[in-house]
């Protein structure tokens, strides 16, 4: 029996010949060119995530070298100069080459999906921003290849330590210009994010239907535009001092304090630039695994706006011991910024309260974040008080505090986001057992490393020192901290194995929302999404459009609960008519 319109004769032979042609395989060169020239926000997001994670591993190795040096008194494996280079580049890498671009990676991948956009507003600018970040970072790190080594004046580059007399090497110039280069990429990326959020939201997505993560990306972008131009100006002025004798930061003219004001006016908003997006990730994860909508959605947005506003008023709390700042004002503003942060915790815990909690790996990391960040916040209250700060400033107490705050936010939320969105990134789920092994080894290793450093700081151990005396009494605590730091470092290995195992043996999820209770719009498209993200967009009538799509009966109940009297009558009348 023949099929209608089946080709006959020569046409059939030609068709048969075409069907027998081998399928063209992907050539490695084609794949490389595609990745190097892509303007797809998802691919660019992947590049940001992979590159920033690679820098995370490099910065972690430097941290382990420093901890190995400090395990016992005396110089073990590094000279003092090498130690200075290690702690300078460790801080620079972790803050400006890992945490900041990690935000750009998650924002690139997830934000356009959550607002129903086909891409970002300026795709080519997006790619240009990534290359600025990559090459700027490589220039800064490339100082290790120069005869005098990398920058060694601390990641904050205090003047006059960073001038041409005290830091004459080319590595310092590469650090300055590399960070300026990378910072331009961050600025351009933030312009892109703000424009995309303002101009490219799907029909029905008002500002107060946007996911919390999108709100946080928007406010982070605003902070970048406030902070990074100040850093760029300060870096160019410092380079002018070094190369052209500009005398901007001469100590005789008050330049040392001027540098600190400029740098920390960037530096403290930077803390929230690397905190707010990761608060947003936690705000996406907790409702899904609590089986509840976010408690206090409007209050959470208000708290985020308050944190962003207050973050540019507290920079001089890094400068209490200089004697050149108004202590009551900056102390009060620092205490004040704890209030909206407390509101956020109230919202997160309120969402979990009486929820149907499910501790899959993303929720486990989110819970670890809540515990760790709380510890960091408590020590922050101590440091906000000038009389107490005077005693522990520049000690390991400060090191412990900011690692609890920064690591507790960025790394815990990063792993939570990886496990939560991995099926959206790749179409496959990461292994739960390996994820929990990673969590517990990292959790124990982290707290063992840094909890002890509070006590070291209280006993008077200064930060940035390459050595100490056996008579100082710091040996036992330093040894414990170093052992736990290597456990922390080893915790990354199960995650890397998990990624490899999932890529090679993982089964495709086959559904839009493998978690079953996803609320935001990225869970209303396939895993992974098509090139322009959506084939069709669901109706957006709340801040949980994907949940409304997959659970229409609950959405109808919510609509009835939140409707006015006239709307309730209409809904009820429609139900009766349906019967």
From Swiss-Prot:
<dbReference type="InterPro" id="IPR036927">
    <property type="entry name" value="Cyt_c_oxase-like_su1_sf"/>
</dbReference>
<feature type="transmembrane region" description="Helical">
    <location>
        <begin position="44"/>
        <end position="64"/>
    </location>
</feature>
<keyword id="KW-0349">Heme</keyword>
<feature type="binding site">
    <location>
        <position position="317"/>
    </location>
    <ligand>
        <name>Cu cation</name>
    </ligand>
</feature>
<dbReference type="InterPro" id="IPR014241">
    <property type="entry name" value="Cyt_c_oxidase_su1_bac"/>
</dbReference>
<dbReference type="GO" id="GO:0046872">
    <property type="term" value="F:metal ion binding"/>
</dbReference>
<feature type="transmembrane region" description="Helical">
    <location>
        <begin position="125"/>
        <end position="145"/>
    </location>
</feature>
<feature type="transmembrane region" description="Helical">
    <location>
        <begin position="174"/>
        <end position="194"/>
    </location>
</feature>
<keyword id="KW-0408">Iron</keyword>
<comment type="function">
    <text>Cytochrome c oxidase is the component of the respiratory chain that catalyzes the reduction of oxygen to water. Subunits 1-3 form the functional core of the enzyme complex. CO I is the catalytic subunit of the enzyme. Electrons originating in cytochrome c are transferred via the copper A center of subunit 2 and heme A of subunit 1 to the bimetallic center formed by heme A3 and copper B.</text>
</comment>
<feature type="binding site">
    <location>
        <position position="318"/>
    </location>
    <ligand>
        <name>Cu cation</name>
    </ligand>
</feature>
<keyword id="KW-1278">Translocase</keyword>
<dbReference type="GO" id="GO:0004129">
    <property type="term" value="F:cytochrome-c oxidase activity"/>
</dbReference>
<comment type="pathway">
    <text>Energy metabolism; oxidative phosphorylation.</text>
</comment>
<dbReference type="InterPro" id="IPR023615">
    <property type="entry name" value="Cyt_c_Oxase_su1_BS"/>
</dbReference>
<feature type="binding site">
    <location>
        <position position="268"/>
    </location>
    <ligand>
        <name>Cu cation</name>
    </ligand>
</feature>
<dbReference type="Pfam" id="PF00115">
    <property type="entry name" value="COX1"/>
</dbReference>
<feature type="binding site" description="axial binding residue">
    <location>
        <position position="401"/>
    </location>
    <ligand>
        <name>heme a3</name>
    </ligand>
</feature>
<protein>
    <recommendedName>
        <fullName>Probable cytochrome c oxidase subunit 1-alpha</fullName>
        <ecNumber>7.1.1.9</ecNumber>
    </recommendedName>
</protein>
<feature type="transmembrane region" description="Helical">
    <location>
        <begin position="480"/>
        <end position="500"/>
    </location>
</feature>
<feature type="transmembrane region" description="Helical">
    <location>
        <begin position="93"/>
        <end position="113"/>
    </location>
</feature>
<dbReference type="GO" id="GO:0020037">
    <property type="term" value="F:heme binding"/>
</dbReference>
<dbReference type="GO" id="GO:0006119">
    <property type="term" value="P:oxidative phosphorylation"/>
</dbReference>
<feature type="transmembrane region" description="Helical">
    <location>
        <begin position="397"/>
        <end position="417"/>
    </location>
</feature>
<feature type="transmembrane region" description="Helical">
    <location>
        <begin position="319"/>
        <end position="339"/>
    </location>
</feature>
<feature type="binding site" description="axial binding residue">
    <location>
        <position position="403"/>
    </location>
    <ligand>
        <name>Fe(II)-heme a</name>
    </ligand>
</feature>
<keyword id="KW-1003">Cell membrane</keyword>
<keyword id="KW-0186">Copper</keyword>
<dbReference type="InterPro" id="IPR023616">
    <property type="entry name" value="Cyt_c_oxase-like_su1_dom"/>
</dbReference>
<feature type="transmembrane region" description="Helical">
    <location>
        <begin position="262"/>
        <end position="282"/>
    </location>
</feature>
<feature type="binding site">
    <location>
        <position position="272"/>
    </location>
    <ligand>
        <name>Cu cation</name>
    </ligand>
</feature>
<keyword id="KW-0812">Transmembrane</keyword>
<feature type="transmembrane region" description="Helical">
    <location>
        <begin position="363"/>
        <end position="383"/>
    </location>
</feature>
<keyword id="KW-0479">Metal-binding</keyword>
<comment type="subunit">
    <text>Associates with subunits II, III and IV to form cytochrome c oxidase.</text>
</comment>
<feature type="transmembrane region" description="Helical">
    <location>
        <begin position="437"/>
        <end position="457"/>
    </location>
</feature>
<keyword id="KW-0249">Electron transport</keyword>
<feature type="binding site" description="axial binding residue">
    <location>
        <position position="90"/>
    </location>
    <ligand>
        <name>Fe(II)-heme a</name>
    </ligand>
</feature>
<dbReference type="GO" id="GO:0015990">
    <property type="term" value="P:electron transport coupled proton transport"/>
</dbReference>
<keyword id="KW-0472">Membrane</keyword>
<feature type="cross-link" description="1'-histidyl-3'-tyrosine (His-Tyr)">
    <location>
        <begin position="268"/>
        <end position="272"/>
    </location>
</feature>
<dbReference type="GO" id="GO:0022904">
    <property type="term" value="P:respiratory electron transport chain"/>
</dbReference>
